[in-house]
Swiss-Prot record:
Disulfide bonds: none annotated. This is Large ribosomal subunit protein bL9. The gene is rplI. Signal peptide: none annotated. Pfam families: Ribosomal_L9_C, Ribosomal_L9_N. One of its GO terms (molecular function) is rRNA binding. It comes from Pelodictyon phaeoclathratiforme (strain DSM 5477 / BU-1). InterPro entries: Ribosomal_bL9 (IPR000244), Ribosomal_bL9/RNase_H1_N (IPR009027), Ribosomal_bL9_bac/chp (IPR020594), Ribosomal_bL9_C (IPR020069), Ribosomal_bL9_C_sf (IPR036791), Ribosomal_bL9_N (IPR020070), Ribosomal_bL9_N_sf (IPR036935). Binds to the 23S rRNA.
Length: 151
């Protein structure tokens, strides 16, 4: 029997794939558990239209991500942190601080998608990588300044 997988099944394949399985496995396990549906003409057509819509949606999201990437590349962020007279920070600048600075500029990126190569413990100019889509990573340029120097 041919079925369309609704979820990823380790032994069979990924969601959306059409696979051939034994009748008993499909009728007694996959279909009742909601892991698959029967592959009929109607469901196959529905699957194709859903895949086309999904592809269009992903392309639109990728286009918006590229636009965001260009905006972020040109941006110059300022991150404020407590610092001593010598320019050494009390603590470190984290990805959460960079995410907050981006949010203040109107760009919302999850802090877990921002990576800093080395701990930032002094004032100065730095770069971080931000993954804004599946395959689009952008360099975020920012400057760490002492908290009292805000204008």
């Amino acid at each position: 029997m041919k079925v369309i997988l609704r979820n990823n099944v380790a032994t069979l394949g990924d969601a959306g794939e059409v696979v051939a399985v034994k009748n008993g496995y499909a009728n007694n396990f996959l279909i009742p558990q909601g892991m698959a549906i029967r592959a009929t003409e109607g469901t196959l057509k529905a699957l194709e239209t859903e895949k086309k819509q999904q592809t269009k949606k992903i392309e639109l999201q990728r286009k918006h991500a590229r636009e965001h990437a260009q905006t972020i590349e040109q941006m110059s962020l300022k991150v404020y942190a407590k610092a001593g007279d010598s320019g050494k920070l009390f603590g470190t600048v984290t990805s959460a601080d960079i995410a907050d600075a981006l949010k203040a500029q109107g760009i919302d990126i999850d802090r877990r998608k921002i990576t800093i190569e080395a701990p930032i413990k002094s004032l100065g100019k730095y770069e971080a990588d931000a993954k804004i889509f599946q395959d689009i990573t952008v360099k975020v340029h920012f400057e760490v300044e002492a908290e009292g120097s805000e204008a």
